[in-house]
Amino acid sequence: MLLVLLTLILPPLQGAVETKDYKASLFGIKSNGTTLNTRSIQKAIDFIHDRGGGRLVFDVGRYLTGTIYLKSGVTIHLLEGAVLVGSPNPFDYDTQHNWTALLFALEQENVGITGEGGVIDGQGFTVANNLVDLIHKGLVEDPLRNDRPREAIRPQNIYFWRCTGVRVEDITLKDPASWNQQYDQCREVTIKNLIIDSKSYWNNDGVDIVDCDTVEVANLHIDAADDGICLKSHDKNAVCQNVYIHDNVVRTSANGIKFGTASLGGFKNVRIMNNLVYDTYRSAITMAAVDGGFVEDVVVDGLKSINTGNVIFLRIGERWQPGKKGRMKNISISNVYAEVPEKKADAGYNYEGPWEHQPRNISPSSIVGLPGAPIEDITLKNIEIHHPGGGDPNFARVGLDELDKVPELPSNYPEFSMFKELPAWGFYLRHVKNLTMENIKLVAEKKDYRRAIVIDDVEGARIKGLAVKEPGPKKDPVFIYKSTGVKIEK
């Protein structure tokens, strides 16, 4: 079934052309971990590219380097025990582009980074702190907000821009100084079978897919300080589309799988299947259209979320383009099992998420549009959420007679906790059109003053097979406010 689905969604992916193997040692590339190999590695890549392509193969050892550029037809191949090590010196990285990276590929075809258990180690903590030191000494200019350099001047492990036919497979990517890997306006991209350890510094995303077309993200094991798998749209004239995300395991101190926050263009035709999110501070799945762009035609099927602070967060906003609200429609989320903890889900991990938007009781999943800009055509099916409950009105309270006091916050950064206290513990649904909820099971472990579901300004909703279990006096699980066409069936 998955093979058939992949064939339907993605055309055949063209990988790097592996016509011949070249050992790194033939080019004088040293494996001692102390010799800076930037020039010799680049000469090797240029040599292979000029001769029609092939693989530059690294055997056991530690290969220190600054910025290198992949070229068409060339694959870097890391054998087991081979480690490509980023230089700790910030001046060894190229800063002439919008982003800084250890490995660049710009407007190339059939490029790849593959391996048999090899590693790319960005030494991000050391690089970032050395960069901070240079900024304090006046040798590098940066506003240094919160004593952190901007993301763009800290090296990512991988940055590919406008490339076609990309393969990144069977390696470990660890310790970037910024995002771990970014694929920007690329086509025909395969990212699979990776171990991603991304907890060395702030903004350590696992993988970022930006305005790309035809992408497969599969079998990744991600441990990240920031968003795990993140789709972005930086260009208002571009779309991130035809993306298939499946069979991944994600742990983050932010969101497991996220659309946005940058959402200038849009996201279309995305399939997210059979993924596990655990020990994650924010939401298992977040979709945000807050910068004038759109999200449409998305299917999430098969999501297990364990010890995750929130399950589902869908949000329309109006952040960077005043007067142009985001749009979101045709979203299906099904076959979800989730456990929300009472305590902080990422406690003890490096770079924990901040305990934000207090005071509030433990938040519900939420689908929130804007007045006059509803989120449309939403299906939630076969979803089971175990929530700690315990909402205490003496700690924080929004009563059912105070729903108009819940702020709209169209220009705020979108986060599941952004509204502070909400009047529901299971689902908060506001500014939605055409909603279907089938076979939803909500379990609260403790008595909660809030209703399980609050429906506010919803036009057309069908709820069938709702099961709610919570201790305490029985109350109607659904509260409907300023809504039309809402039907609740057994």
Residue locations for each model-derived region?
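Extracellular/periplasmic carbohydrate-active domains that bind, remodel
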Residues: L6-K490
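Sec-dependent signal peptide recognition
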Residues: M1-L5
